[in-house]
Amino acid sequence: MTTQDVIVNDQNDQKQCSNDVIFRSRLPDIYIPNHLPLHDYIFENISEFAAKPCLINGPTGEVYTYADVHVTSRKLAAGLHNLGVKQHDVVMILLPNSPEVVLTFLAASFIGAITTSANPFFTPAEISKQAKASAAKLIVTQSRYVDKIKNLQNDGVLIVTTDSDAIPENCLRFSELTQSEEPRVDSIPEKISPEDVVALPFSSGTTGLPKGVMLTHKGLVTSVAQQVDGENPNLYFNRDDVILCVLPMFHIYALNSIMLCSLRVGATILIMPKFEITLLLEQIQRCKVTVAMVVPPIVLAIAKSPETEKYDLSSVRMVKSGAAPLGKELEDAISAKFPNAKLGQGYGMTEAGPVLAMSLGFAKEPFPVKSGACGTVVRNAEMKILDPDTGDSLPRNKPGEICIRGNQIMKGYLNDPLATASTIDKDGWLHTGDVGFIDDDDELFIVDRLKELIKYKGFQVAPAELESLLIGHPEINDVAVVAMKEEDAGEVPVAFVVRSKDSNISEDEIKQFVSKQVVFYKRINKVFFTDSIPKAPSGKILRKDLRARLANGLMN
């Protein structure tokens, strides 16, 4: 529903009134126990499913029950504490997807510590920068990555490796820490405040330098509850579900919407360390995956792969995509591959914890939804759309900057009050930098990012719109559209295109394909053919890398 709220701000003893158009979920608000520490909330109902499979290690087939995960994470918490990791200390996870990611995150939470996760394929300099910025005291990793971080030992950073074989010199063995006396963990932490930070992901840096995002116990409890709690949860997971986790767990989407949401409801998580299309399809068939949480590059690979015809994918009842909008053509293609699945999207950003909106088609009692929509605002939260030029809130069907307010958003950026103040205003609204609108049925549609909009002679051109058209062409495997400087127009849209296998589609053919479907100022000016589109682990296109190619004359 939408309400016209009169908001009164007291500034210098002068009251000022303004009408804000605020959007809320079509689902009713629910009670959220966000006074609890995250681990207590996650395991609140564990007695009901302690013997049930919790984690399946895809490569090995090893299964951990909920009781195994609970006990082992508590023992690991005691082991970390014995090494000197205290409340508010930071533990870095430098691992591919594995059960140890789950165990380490929960163990840190138990002792009031904070986890920051980094991509193990980062360069040594990138890892070092994050470790130092977060003041990491201990790093959990695999032996093959130790060379990247061993210089940090000079600063007193401890390194724990998860390998079962021989470990590098001066490193500790993960398995030894999990054999510590488990009951001692109860007396370890001081009282954990709901406002204490529990996770410190670093934002993708697609519009600036990476910054530590402080997510609290209260924030993550709220975010998980907004998704999976209540009589009619927005994201209906159940204890019989097998949830696919192929998205990187060092990204907040997998950490929250897959790992934490699954643990809360007692579902089984199938953990896969990397995406490989044939292996993915084999595991879906073998483990009878019911929920596939994906991002557009994976959707694209599945939709365009002939391998899918060889496997039984009928167990999948839900396919949820996030990180970037899907076009209708891609939605239709993936629906054909998963005939029994509901397909929908969610919308989030790290700073929002991360979920702002989610398809109500995923609810236990689903609502009708439209193709291309990114869902409706989550319950127990508020959303508004602002005019980027005037700052006024906008009514339905008017595109503007998306803003969100609620207990789930970040506490702020680590050691960066200026960046925090420019993102969260004095009234608690988080400004996303994304452009979208809410229609007559409360559904959110993303237009693009403010800074990614192309300005052609004053006209705004949204890259996502053109990408959606282009990806529907059968001879195009992947695409990204960015702005290129042009003296007359200011900026013109250009496309980086990955041809489909055996395709020889030309630049002129692509231009004509688009020109027939858009107004004159949205026409593609140039096409550059490339082997791949650079993307962040979250699936978002790294447009700044493509703009750098243009600036350096390295288009092809």
From Swiss-Prot:
Pfam families: AMP-binding, AMP-binding_C. Keywords: Acetylation, ATP-binding, Ligase, Magnesium, Nucleotide-binding, Phenylpropanoid metabolism. GO terms for molecular function: (E)-caffeate-CoA ligase activity; 4-coumarate-CoA ligase activity; ATP binding. Its cofactor is Mg(2+). Changing residue 401 to Q: Slighlty reduces the substrate specificity. CDD domains: 4CL. The modification N-acetylthreonine is found at residue 2. GO terms for biological process: phenylpropanoid metabolic process. InterPro entries: AMP-bd_C, AMP-bd_C_sf, AMP-binding_CS, AMP-dep_synth/lig_dom, ANL_N_sf. This is 4-coumarate--CoA ligase 2. It comes from Arabidopsis thaliana (Mouse-ear cress).
